UniProtKB/Swiss-Prot annotation:
Role of this protein: Catalyzes the reversible adenylation of nicotinate mononucleotide (NaMN) to nicotinic acid adenine dinucleotide (NaAD).
Sequence similarity: Belongs to the NadD family.
Record carries keyword Transmembrane: no
Pfam family, any one: CTP_transf_like
Name the record gives this protein: Probable nicotinate-nucleotide adenylyltransferase
Gene3D superfamilies for this protein: HUPs
Alphabetical GO biological process terms: NAD biosynthetic process
Amino acid sequence: MNTMNSVLKYKELALYGGSFDPLHKAHLAIIDQTLELLPFAKLIVLPAYQNPFKKPCFLDAKTRFKELERALKGMPRVLLSDFEIKQERAVPTIESVIFFQKLYRPKTLYLVIGADCLRHLSSWTNATELLKRVELVVFERIGYEEIQFKGHYHPLKGIDAPISSSAIRASLGV
């Protein structure tokens, strides 16, 4: 994991945002697979202060950030950003995309999302503008195998771990 300045030499950036509530092995598998799919990209992991489509987080933002910090140590192509957490509100993805495009001016900016998010992407703030600014990297989710999306995206396959923080919270009775 690196500092913000280390990103400047990368022409390709990828953003992977989420609640990470809690962080689990599928999140880490997605990070590994994204780095493999995009060998020249720097990956910015972007924990949300609050996901605009979900109820408030179980774990506070500081705890989630620290969990990610520990898990991402020793990953030189990964940057952990607190941009959304510092806003102390739900931040639309387009706002984060514009922020990182202005900050680093990458030639290509990828957005890593789940197939479940792709299904309702049209309901996101300024979705049309978002799709003009990014290339999508979409990871599989159980129950979303048949993606109905007319645009181009890079499929991210081979995530063997179940991907559900909400299922983990439910098993803990939270």
